[in-house]
């Protein structure tokens, strides 16, 4: 485990008053080396915080007294302090495999870490999820989480993930929901693989097995010019239209049974099918906006508000001129 490094000390904060500086390494908080920023935040919420930091090879002990729940005033270099749980799936549609060579190393990191799902909305397949992970999520109420489903058929799912554990790892999804952890799902549609009848089966079984899912975003596979999987292709207009019909059908069933639509199609499917975007209310709370679902409708709604008279320019501008250093070339 590497020690997290301080990137910023907020002026006027408890950390600044204690003498912490940029570059200090965080060795322990209240006698514990936190494994991630989640555990760190829980530890520093206490009114009395004991820190051990490493500076120039020397360990320094600091006692800090602050208001309970008040921020300590540090920004650290990473959210995960022990080790990111990497992905051992080999999905043929994985976007990491479709990146060009020669880019920065961090872009090639395939994570399958529930902590990054909680912190940033990353999708996890749960193929590396464990009993210990479940216990922590339940105890600390770490939600919402985001889970890649793709298909409920074990053979189809394990084939898409190219991992035999893909056939069984959705048991963790059921366990999370049974403990009332909020979970959003995702289905990446690959033509002839998990669309058509497989998609209909997946939607039907989700309603039966996982009715507590907060939402299920359904997005088409994305391919770059660096894709090496010759069996993959994007949707035709007819395929996109057929998948939208399936999604809309199961939306109606979900609304009848659960009082909410549950299933939501990406903007790209509507564009590919040549169909208009649904009305605002069809997206309910825009729970998968960052997954490309409802962005176009939200944009149109914003334009409508502007056309109805919302001023484009602020009525008054105050402040002072400042110079900003240019970014390095």
Map each language-model feature to its residues:
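Short, compositionally biased
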Residues: 38-52, 67-69
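PDZ/PDZ-like groove recognition
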Residues: 1-10
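Conserved Radical SAM active-site core
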Residues: 57-59, 66-212, 220-250
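Short, Lys/Arg- and Gly-enriched loop/turn segments at beta-strand edges
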Residues: 32-40, 60-62
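Hard-cation-handling environments
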Residues: 244-329
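Conserved PDZ fold ligand-binding element
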Residues: 17-35
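Short alpha-helix capping/helix-loop boundary micro-motifs
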Residues: 10-15, 35-37
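Terminal peptide-recognition signature
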Residues: 15, 23-26, 51, 94
